[in-house]
Swiss-Prot record:
Organism field: Caenorhabditis elegans
Gene responsible for this protein: mcm-5
Top-rank taxon, per record: Eukaryota
UniProt domain MCM: residue ranges: 330-536
Keywords (A to Z) from UniProt: ATP-binding, Cell cycle, Cytoplasm, DNA replication, DNA-binding, Helicase, Hydrolase, Nucleotide-binding, Nucleus
Name by which UniProt lists this protein: DNA replication licensing factor mcm-5
Motif (Arginine finger): 511-514
Function: Acts as a component of the MCM2-7 complex (MCM complex) which is the replicative helicase essential for 'once per cell cycle' DNA replication initiation and elongation in eukaryotic cells. Core component of CDC45-MCM-GINS (CMG) helicase, the molecular machine that unwinds template DNA during replication, and around which the replisome is built.
């Protein structure tokens, strides 16, 4: 049992504690002490050229702040002594305890004398950072077991914080023999109690039984630990494959640092643990081990919305971004580079460009935030390239998640609570809108979703949070993402005569979209000929590219011979890689605000749209002029502000000027206002014209006068009477009937043929 106290054996990360190698322990002790001395010198003396010793000062500052931790950059350690840095990377199980012991010694030196009541010296936790590109989760193999690795991904689940013993005291139940301060291996390996009593058995009346030891809870030293679930980044997952996961083990000051949905970069020890088996499991699995990562450092990607791998940009790339932003046609060029293989749809592409860049997120003095992300809905006929636009946005967005309406549930889009198979406690897993925090969620077949699932994303689209209150877990997750949705008509193709009957959406979900486009497949000889030529040309070029690949002709490089990123492709459009980096750069470094002149112009337009001009003759006669203007609400006003800010962001401007507001108003008119003016959004908050609203009120008053309470009338006859004799639109009459039925004033009977007035 003496080996239990041997630090050399305790920190070895192998399948078994004893490798069969004879070891006196003297060499290990001497090496251990030498490592402590080297690390002690590093912490005390390392400097980057200034007057201060960065790690000594950091340790002193943290210790007096009651944060007993020290963060060390491995590149600094490499500059100080490359040999011990290599040992720490290759054998962290052996070397890390020496580093923490050295930190504790230095802390004792620099904090003596300590205040009264704080004389006890606390253990120091050492966390690591690494200045190198993270490894993909798929590239971490068995060769890296027990070595330091750096990987990135998304946290999708987090268990609750628990306690784990680091030192235990064992006592024999029979003879009360005690083994104090038995060290427990860090990580998820656990600890096996000795099978036999270590006390001398001579002279005892009764021998101690097998498995005699128990732990004394009041004499154990414990630390906090938490297990997390890491999923590889969506952009790293090959098409057609499932994203891979890895369990993370955090302890002490690294617990409670992240929540599901956070993008993180992890430095840790790639470790293995025994495979958990049920009773009577397969005996051939005894040698199988499950990988997990013992975390030594967590870096959250909090550089802002639009987080991606492009967190740093070269001076040459920044020069290219500013050159593009200074062009007069920058806005037009970016819009044309959105899915260039799709013909036409210029305004839709401009709106998608605005969605990619987004407006400026604002936090008000009272703590309320105003979203800067833009939501766009595409409604219309099949075959109008809506899904292709969504697929392109998924590629070019810094963080893009694509999902289909029929295959999406409320839990899959927002968050779910599941039971942890190990601890049997409930843990939370983030859905698509949580994982896309800082990016774009593309929802295809939006009309095929169940209504209950659509309601679940109301909060995420406006407040940009997801509140969870399930299974004893009450929390709020961030979902700061834009939504690009595509839907078809209820009747397959768009029917002009049916107006708003083409869509089956609640007004609450439609009002959360900043721009709504009705995409129709109209018949036009000239347009059809141009479109057909474009489609054929795309297919011919694709076939030629495939033949070049077969012949071994190299593809067009995304970087030139000097390694500088290419700005334009062969057709004169921006390359996908450049556009993706430019979107990231603009979202990180630009947050435009409206100028006073632009604000005043927007206020004037808002007032005009809310209160249309009354002509002089009608004013003199005391009557209002007949108008069909759409009185917009404050929610649509905020949408116009976001659109103007996004256009300014494409030009890397700090302020949105008059021209940006004019273009934002134009985009809003050709999208939402045009869709509402044609009656396709009638009944939606703020999208019913004044004339239609007055007609609806008149029809309701006349209908209630036509038949008394308790009488029956044919629905067909009353609709025909209002349409033929009083010349109202059939859609308005049916809408009034639907409203009265919904309010409970009318009931439909006899297979919806008769109407019965209840009140």
């Amino acid at each position: 049992m003496s080996n239990l106290d041997n630090p050399g054996i305790y920190y070895q990360e192998r399948f078994f504690a004893n490798d069969g190698v004879p070891d006196t322990g003297r060499e290990l002790i001497a090496e251990y002490r030498q490592l402590i001395t080297q690390f002690r010198n590093f912490i005390r003396d390392f400097s980057t050229g200034g007057f201060g010793m960065i790690y000594r000062d950091q340790l002193k500052r943290n210790y007096f702040s009651h944060e007993y931790r020290l963060e060390i950059n491995l590149n600094h350690l490499k500059n100080f002594d490359e040999d011990i840095e290599m040992k720490l990377r290759k054998f962290p199980g052996k070397v890390l305890p020496a580093l923490e012991e050295a930190a504790k010694i230095v802390a004792d030196e620099i904090t003596t004398p300590r205040p009264k009541g704080e004389e006890k010296l606390h253990d120091i936790q050492v966390t690591l950072t690494l200045d190198e590109y993270p490894t993909s989760l798929r590239q971490v193999k068995s060769a890296q077991v027990s070595q330091v690795v750096k990987i990135s991904g998304i946290i999708v689940a987090a268990a609750q914080v628990r306690s784990k013993a680091t030192k235990v005291t064992l006592q024999c139940r029979q003879c009360k023999h005690t083994i104090p301060d038995v060290s427990i291996k860090p990580g998820l390996e656990g600890f096996a109690l000795p099978r036999t009593c270590a006390a001398p058995q001579q002279g005892q009346m009764q021998r101690c039984p097998i498995d005699p030891y128990i732990m004394l809870p009041d004499k154990c030293e414990c630390v906090d630990y938490q297990t997390l679930k890491l999923q590889e980044n969506p952009e790293d997952v090959p098409h057609g494959e499932m994203p891979r996961h890895l369990q993370l083990f955090t302890e002490r000051y690294l617990t409670d640092k992240v929540v599901p949905g956070n993008r993180v970069t992890i430095v840790g020890v790639y470790s293995i643990k025994k495979l958990i088996q049920k009773k009577g499991g397969d005996k051939s699995l005894q040698g199988i081990r499950t990988p997990y990562l013992r975390v030594l450092g967590i870096h959250m990607e909090t550089s802002g919305p639009g987080r991606t791998n492009f967190t740093t940009f070269t001076p040459e790339e920044e020069r290219m971004f500013k050159t593009l932003a200074q062009r007069k046609d920058a806005y037009e060029l970016i819009a044309k580079s959105i899915a260039p293989s799709i013909y036409g749809s210029a305004d839709i592409k401009k709106s998608i460009a605005c969605l990619l860049f987004g407006g400026a997120r604002k936090k008000l003095p009272d703590g309320i935030t105003r979203r800067g992300d833009i939501n766009v809905l595409l409604l219309g006929d099949p075959g109008t390239a809506k899904s292709q636009l969504l697929k392109f946005v998924e590629q070019v967005s810094p963080i893009g998640v694509y999902t289909s309406g029929k295959g999406s549930s409320a839990a899959g889009l927002t968050a779910s609570v599941i039971r942890d198979p190990q601890s049997r406690s409930f843990i939370m897993e983030g859905g698509a809108m949580v994982l896309a925090d800082g990016g774009v969620v593309c929802i295809d077949e939006f009309d095929k979703m169940r209504e209950d699932d659509r309601v679940a994303i109301h909060e995420a689209m406006e407040q940009q949070t997801i509140s969870i209150a399930k299974a004893g877990i009450t929390t709020t997750l961030n979902s700061r993402c834009s939504v690009l949705a595509a839907a078809n008509s209820v009747y397959g193709r768009w029917d002009e005569s049916r107006g708003d009957d083409n869509i089956d959406f609640m007004p609450t979900i439609l009002s959360r979209f900043d721009m709504i486009y009705i995409v129709k497949d109209t018949h036009d000889v000239l347009k059809d000929a141009t479109l057909a030529k474009h489609v054929i040309e795309v297919h011919v070029n694709a076939s030629a590219a495939k033949e070049r690949d077969i012949a071994g002709v190299p593809k067009t490089a995304t970087t030139d011979s000097d390694g500088v990123m290419t700005m334009f492709d062969t057709d004169g459009f921006l390359t996908i890689e450049f556009l993706k980096k430019f979107v990231t750069y603009a979202r990180l470094n630009c947050g435009p605000r409206l100028t006073p002149q632009a604000s005043e112009k927007l206020v004037n337009h808002y007032v005009k749209m809310r209160n249309p001009v009354v002509n002089a003759d009608a004013f003199k006669s005391g009557k209002k002029a007949h108008n069909s203007a759409i009185p917009i609400t404050v929610r649509q006003l905020e949408a116009i502000v976001r659109i103007a800010e996004s256009i300014a962001k494409m030009e890397l401007q700090q302020f949105a000027t008059d021209k940006h507001v004019e273009e934002a108003l134009r985009l809003f008119r050709v999208s939402t206002i045009e869709a509402a003016a044609t009656g396709n959004l009638a009944g939606v908050e703020g999208f019913t014209s004044t004339a239609d609203q007055e007609a609806l009120n008149r029809i309701e008053v006349q209908m209630k006068k036509r038949f008394a309470i308790g009488t029956h009338v044919s629905e067909h006859l009353i609709v025909q009477d209002f349409v033929a004799r009083q010349h109202y639109r059939e859609s308005l009459v049916k809408k009034v009937i639907d409203n009265l039925v919904r309010r409970g004033d009318l009931q439909q009977k006899m297979q919806r043929k008769m109407l019965y007035r209840v009140r």
